C-alpha cells in the first residue's frame, strides 16, 4: 500500500468531503425548521460536538497509531468483531447513499442551465436523462480511481480550491447586503409554532450532514505519508468548514427574512445570489455547486471504496474485497461500491426520491460509527483530558441518536439487518482465531428479529 498523501492532500480530502452539496442548500434547509436563535444554539452544539469528535480522532491517531483502518478499526478493537463490522457497514452505507445524493444534486444543478417551464430535462436530478448522465459520471470517476488514489487526491485538491471561490464571493456580498433588522425579525421563530428547543433538535441531522466526512483523513490514514498529519488535517478542515457554515447561514438570514428564505428553491444560495447581484448570481452558484459536488463525490468514492477493503483485510468483509490492482487501488471494493451506487440511481428514478430523502438516510447511518469513536477513546484513555474528550464525544453521539427520532432509528435497524448476513458469510471466507461470544450471537438474533416489525412499521 503506497503512503503518498501529505498534509495538504489529506486536508483537502476532508474539507472537500464536508463542503459538498449541503452548503449550497443550507440557507433554505435551516430557515425551514429554525429561527435565528435556534440556529445559533444548534451551530453551537454541533460545532462543539464535531470538534470533540475531531479531537477524539486526533488523540486516537496519537495513542493508537497502529490502528490505521479508521473508525471501523476503533470499533472493532474496542468492542469486538460484530460491533466493528456494524461500524464499517453503517459507514459504508452512508458513503454509498452520500455518493448517490451527490450525483442527484449535480444534475439538479444542471437544470438551472437547461430546464425551462416548457422543458423539464434534468428536473430535481431524478429524471431518466439525469440518471443516464449520473451513471456516466459514476463510471468515469470509477476508472479514474482505479488509476490510483494519489491521482484522484491530486485532482481533488484542485477541485477544493475551485469550490472556495463562489463561496467566498457569496460571503463577501452577503456581508455587504446584511441588515441587522432583517436578521432579528421573529428572532425566536414564533411563526414556526414550535418551541426553540424543538427547533434546535430539528436542525441536528442537517448540521450533522454537512460535517459528514470529518473522518476522511482517518479512513485513508494507512495511505498517509506522516501519521501525525492525519489529526492536523482533520482539525484544520473542521475549523475551516465550521467558519464557512456559520457565515453562510447567519448572513443569509440578514439578507432575506426567514419565512421568505424557507420558500426559496434549492440550491437556495443561487436564489440569494440573484437577490444580491442579479441573474448572473444563479449561474455562478450553480457552476460552483457542480464543481463542489464533483470534488466531494471524488472524496467520498475514495473513502467508500476504502471501507470494504480495510474491513476485508481485518476479516470483517468477504475476503474478495481485500484485492488491490497494480496501482494499489482497492479494485474489488470499488466495483462493489459503484455497482451499489448504480442500483440506487435506478431506484431513485423509479421512486422519484430527491436529495433531501437521501440526506436523512445517510445522516442516520453515520450515527453509530461516530458514537463508537468517542466510546473507544473513553474506554482506553488514561489521561483526564482524553477521558473528558471521550465523554463529550459520547454525549454528542447520544444526543444525535435522540434528536434523530424513533422512525429514523427504525430505519437504521432495517438497513443494518442485511449487513449481518454479509458478516456471517464473511466469517466463512476467512480463517478466524476468535469465535463469536454468546452476547454477539444474541445481538445478531435480536437485530434480525427486530428488523421484521421495523420494516412493517416503516412500510405501514
From Swiss-Prot:
Reactions mediated catalytically: L-ornithine(in) + L-arginine(out) = L-ornithine(out) + L-arginine(in)
InterPro entries: AA/rel_permease1, Amino_acid_antiprt, APC_superfamily
Key word Magnesium present: no
Pfam families documented for this protein: AA_permease_2
Keyword terms of this UniProt record: Amino-acid transport, Antiport, Cell inner membrane, Cell membrane, Membrane, Transmembrane, Transmembrane helix, Transport
Designated name of the protein: Putative arginine/ornithine antiporter
Function: Catalyzes electroneutral exchange between arginine and ornithine to allow high-efficiency energy conversion in the arginine deiminase pathway.
Record topology, Cytoplasmic segments: 1-4, 60-92, 147-157, 223-235, 304-331, 379-384, 427-439
Domain of life: Bacteria
Biological-process GO terms, alphabetical: amino acid transport
A GO MF label: antiporter activity
GO CC list: plasma membrane
Spans through the membrane: 5-25, 39-59, 93-113, 126-146, 158-178, 202-222, 236-256, 283-303, 332-352, 358-378, 385-405, 406-426, 440-460
Amino acid at each position: 500500500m503506497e503512503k503518498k498523501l501529505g498534509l495538504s492532500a489529506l486536508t483537502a480530502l476532508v474539507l472537500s468531503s464536508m463542503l459538498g452539496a449541503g452548503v449550497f442548500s443550507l440557507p433554505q434547509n435551516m430557515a425551514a425548521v429554525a429561527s435565528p436563535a435556534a440556529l445559533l444554539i444548534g451551530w453551537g452544539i454541533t460545532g462543539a460536538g464535531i470538534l470533540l469528535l475531531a479531537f477524539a480522532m486526533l488523540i486516537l491517531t496519537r495513542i493508537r497509531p497502529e490502528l490505521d483502518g479508521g473508525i471501523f478499526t476503533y470499533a472493532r478493537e474496542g468492542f469486538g468483531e460484530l460491533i466493528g463490522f456494524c461500524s464499517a457497514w453503517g459507514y459504508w452505507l452512508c458513503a454509498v447513499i452520500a455518493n448517490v445524493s451527490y450525483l442527484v444534486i449535480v444534475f439538479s444543478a444542471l437544470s438551472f442551465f437547461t430546464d425551462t417551464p416548457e422543458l423539464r430535462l434534468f428536473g430535481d436530478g431524478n429524471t431518466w436523462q439525469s440518471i443516464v448522465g449520473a451513471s456516466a459520471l459514476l463510471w468515469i470517476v470509477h476508472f479514474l480511481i482505479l488509476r490510483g488514489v494519489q491521482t484522484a487526491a491530486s485532482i481533488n485538491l484542485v477541485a477544493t480550491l475551485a469550490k472556495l471561490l463562489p463561496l467566498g464571493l457569496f460571503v463577501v456580498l452577503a456581508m455587504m447586503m446584511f441588515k441587522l433588522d432583517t436578521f432579528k425579525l421573529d428572532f425566536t421563530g414564533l411563526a414556526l409554532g414550535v418551541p426553540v428547543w424543538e427547533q434546535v433538535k430539528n436542525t441536528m441531522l442537517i448540521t450533522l450532514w454537512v460535517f459528514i466526512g470529518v473522518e476522511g483523513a482517518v479512513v485513508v490514514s494507512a495511505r498517509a505519508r506522516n501519521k501525525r498529519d492525519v489529526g492536523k488535517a482533520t482539525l484544520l478542515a473542521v475549523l475551516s468548514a465550521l467558519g464557512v457554515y456559520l457565515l453562510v447561514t447567519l448572513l443569509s438570514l440578514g439578507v432575506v427574512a426567514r419565512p421568505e428564505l424557507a420558500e426559496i428553491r434549492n440550491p437556495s444560495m443561487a436564489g440569494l445570489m440573484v437577490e444580491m447581484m442579479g441573474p448572473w448570481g444563479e449561474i455562478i452558484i450553480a457552476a460552483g455547486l457542480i464543481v463542489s459536488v464533483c470534488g466531494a463525490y471524488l472524496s467520498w468514492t475514495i473513502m467508500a471504496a476504502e471501507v470494504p477493503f480495510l474491513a476485508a483485510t481485518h476479516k470483517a468483509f468477504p475476503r474478495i474485497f481485500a484485492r488491490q490492482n497494480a496501482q494499489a487501488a482497492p479494485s474489488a471494493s470499488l466495483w462493489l461500491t459503484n455497482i451499489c451506487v448504480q442500483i440506487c440511481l435506478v431506484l431513485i428514478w423509479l421512486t422519484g426520491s430527491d436529495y433531501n430523502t437521501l440526506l436523512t438516510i445517510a445522516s442516520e447511518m453515520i450515527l453509530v460509527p461516530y458514537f463508537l469513536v468517542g466510546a473507544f477513546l473513553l474506554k482506553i484513555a488514561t489521561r483526564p483530558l482524553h477521558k473528558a474528550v471521550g465523554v463529550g464525544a459520547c454525549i454528542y453521539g447520544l444526543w444525535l441518536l435522540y434528536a434523530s427520532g424513533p422512525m429514523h432509528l427504525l430505519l437504521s435497524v432495517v438497513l443494518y439487518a442485511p449487513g449481518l448476513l454479509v458478516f456471517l458469510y464473511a466469517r466463512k471466507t476467512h480463517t478466524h482465531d476468535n469465535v463469536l461470544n454468546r452476547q454477539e450471537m444474541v445481538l445478531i438474533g435480536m437485530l434480525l428479529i427486530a428488523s421484521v416489525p421495523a420494516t412493517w412499521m416503516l412500510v405501514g
